[in-house]
């Protein structure tokens, strides 16, 4: 068995663009023969997949699964809406979801490692980068999920509530994007940041600091209500807040998770005209 040195792995990475573990594995299988390793990687699609890895995967699907008191929510990304609807891509996402659920896996890196070979093969087949982006779980007395076109997914956990009510709350979370369950849950750093923004706005209007501070106190109460689930008007009946709805049912929401495909991912927009102009200048 030939020794697989760090310099050999480095050379293969530079020549193929594949990941370190992928290169090391290929070299082990080729008994240290770098040319054979490259040939094998070409056959398996690993090199093609590595070239796709730099492409921004900002489309994709959200998947959820609930059984009893345990639920998981998963985001798997691809590059286009067309591939997001592809049967092979959907099957891959379902398989990842089932494995995460069965093993109660919430470490996305562990999940990525488990499915790396299948991901690479799928990238080579469909020609787009694919990324298992995030996974989260939720436990509670009553759980419900809601998917909006597979692009927005929500899990809600509640106590003393029937499943239909919790389902409606999941739909509310999908539509209204709360960040916290209750106003008192809004973190101190978020409150402080918003307070300073509102104080600056009030001071710019020429108000004395004492009056500006009193104005901001009222605005902060409104702000914490707007970003919390229980403080928001219920989307199906805006005449009452979610807190009032829960009180009517003697119910309580303990937690929720909301995923939206691609949120926070910077998608590169190509200016075709500028690209053509740049190419013409180079010619």
Swiss-Prot record:
Keyword terms: Cytoplasm, Elongation factor, Protein biosynthesis
Localization in the cell: Cytoplasm
One term under GO cellular component: cytoplasm
Domain of life: Bacteria
InterPro entries, sorted: EF-Ts_dimer_sf, Transl_elong_EFTs/EF1B, Transl_elong_EFTs/EF1B_dimer, Transl_elong_Ts_CS, UBA-like_sf
CDD domains on file: UBA_EF-Ts
Main localization (coarse): cytoplasm
Region (Involved in Mg(2+) ion dislocation from EF-Tu): 80-83
Molecular function via GO: translation elongation factor activity
PANTHER family for the chain: ELONGATION FACTOR TS, ELONGATION FACTOR TS, MITOCHONDRIAL
Family note: Belongs to the EF-Ts family.
Protein function: Associates with the EF-Tu.GDP complex and induces the exchange of GDP to GTP. It remains bound to the aminoacyl-tRNA.EF-Tu.GTP complex up to the GTP hydrolysis stage on the ribosome.
Protein name (Swiss-Prot/TrEMBL): Elongation factor Ts
Gene symbol of the encoding locus: tsf
